[in-house]
């Protein structure tokens, strides 16, 4: 039954407009519309209501058409069609054929054997160049199931639907089943849907149309949501990535039906289907280490080129500093890399760069904020060698001759004079410091007494002690009191010691 179904669909795809109208009229369906609408209607009829009478009618129309073709004289030259591109062979008036579908000697099932891996309702323009999508480093393409095909609105409604019926080959099914799981329920080999603008000027990045919804067979597929935005008035952004359809598909020879719902707001979009193998950041890092290491001598020549004297410049550069700290994570570099298109010598860590782009792909250099795609990344062999040789520095300087020297942080030097160290003891009850005395080793010890006292040791003047806790007024008053006391002692003799008043409410500090 499956073989007959595939054969019937191949026959339907070879029909002219008149054949399609006869087939649809045979089952009582509408015969109006463009050719791609009639083809879609007939394919849906074959897919969901293929009775023996309908199959007999399809075969009769097919044999009638090719019997007439074979009886004709030599055909006009024609251009063969790409089996993966769905082109409308008639203009919008439905009268003038643009390109003949096939010649009489072409086996039509062979020509259209791959058409089931395409969108029956999504015609592409033959005269326009093909839409190209950018390569995704984390997705290694195995097969192209459907080339980028434009989403064509069928009416004036804002919400459009475009169905697709396709089947996987046994080899493709085997690849998916035998692939490892990246995480529970997610295979490494996947069937992904990619959507982009229909712009042929340059490779296009993935871009979703408004109100997008993807239905695979009888279940809706999850589409990445919007990033939360805290800024008022700023439209939230959406990560546009390939949509994995594998978990909702029939992994057998049965046909799969995909329906893309999208908002028609003036912009043109194209869709494509690919069989891919998803890679991890560690696999990309290993590949980069294998094919992306730049020889140290080439890196050294680049340093010389950067520091070469420019005769037109009035400023001569004698060296350039390069940090060994990754600007992404502020940690020491382990795998220094940069893009070949970058003008700077500063590197970032390839490990963290790949991990960050695996979560949120931007592929922007963290040093110069310019594009740094994966296929332009290189590992700096010279800086890798420096990292292994210089483990105690966080920065180096490249010199004019290509050599380098580490830049280490200078130790703080003491600005105190090279003299005797003054030992300041605790103050007595009157707030006076004991006078220091110089011992034999040059250190000063504390002795009883108050006030600044100078000492002589081996004919050299001693150091003065200044109490920094007292202000200038209090120190001058203390000096006057001491002078008065000394005069009184000289005249009247020694006076009794004063007793320091002690308040009961005070608590000692120790």
Swiss-Prot record:
Residues 476-492 have a biased composition (Acidic residues). One of its GO terms (biological process) is limb epidermis development. Highly expressed in testis and, at lower levels, in spleen, prostate, ovary, colon and peripheral blood leukocytes. Residues 443-510 are annotated as: Disordered. There is a cross-link at residues 9, 35, 56, 59, 68-69, 125 (Glycyl lysine isopeptide (Lys-Gly) (interchain with G-Cter in SUMO2)). Belongs to the PIAS family. This is E3 SUMO-protein ligase PIAS4. It comes from Homo sapiens (Human). The gene is PIAS4.
